[in-house]
Amino acid sequence: MTNTTSPRPMQKEKKKVIEKATLHPSNKHRDRYDFIALIKTCPELEKYVKINTQGDESIDFANPKAVKWLNKALLQTYYSIENWTIPTGYLCPPIPGRADYIHHIAELLGSSNNGRIPVGNKIRCLDIGVGASCIYPIIGNKEYGWSFIGSEIDPKALASAQRIIQENAFLTKDITLRLQENPKDIFHGIMERSEPVDITICNPPFHSSAEESERETLKKLSSLNKKKITTPVLNFGGQNNELWCEGGEVRFVRDMIRQSKQFSTNC
């Protein structure tokens, strides 16, 4: 992620791509972003693409609008998702990282299936906190054909995810969304006792307080801009419930483990 310094000239030849070796081998985003292809799919992205200080095409990752248009272009180009958007201020997830998570989940499922990654909608995933972007169900369904139950405590986020599904008819048969009315419950109120699932996934709130969340945001933005930032701007967005909870991610995961015992026969 680098800062941008000059307008993007029209390039006739595509530069040699550089592989992101840390990403999963099955990840579609291991190479540098192909901005020519992305702009062809999503012309609105073009005004955010610049030449950075290394001479490469990039966007300003500290700019929330640029990040949102990049996500829209990636989802449309690689996952055939039309009209993707999220409400202002909601978490705008980095697509390559979320795709990596799904591919590692696939390997985990394969490890209990004689090394063969299971595909098709008979595989059911429970996504705790599906978010406004519906990102894990989108990638999991497109890459492996899995079906999903997505839970969410925020009605506005749930409505956003539902709109994305309705805009893309192929998702409607495999993704079901449910509102969690009690924020302290993770499984109860979402799952039926006899309802089978193969795996539970989650992107838990990382931070233990709003102050910690703001401090880490300032640190990240300062790194992106190569200078100290004193006013936080959430380039990837995020509501409070998406960014922090009491006890942070460790407490959240412990609660998941404890509450999952009530549904131990659902797997």
Residue ranges: model-predicted function:
Residues 90, 124-130, 178-179, 200-201:
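Extended hydrophobic secondary-structure segments that form protein cores and membrane-embedded regions
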Residues 153-155, 162-163, 167-267:
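S-adenosylmethionine
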Residues 2-92:
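N-terminal auxiliary segments of SAM/dcSAM-dependent transferases
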Residues 132-146:
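Conserved SAM-binding loop of SAM-dependent methyltransferases across substrates and taxa
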Residues 73-78, 96-124:
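Conserved alpha-helix/loop element of class I SAM-dependent methyltransferases that forms part
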Residues 118-131, 149:
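Conserved class I S-adenosyl-L-methionine
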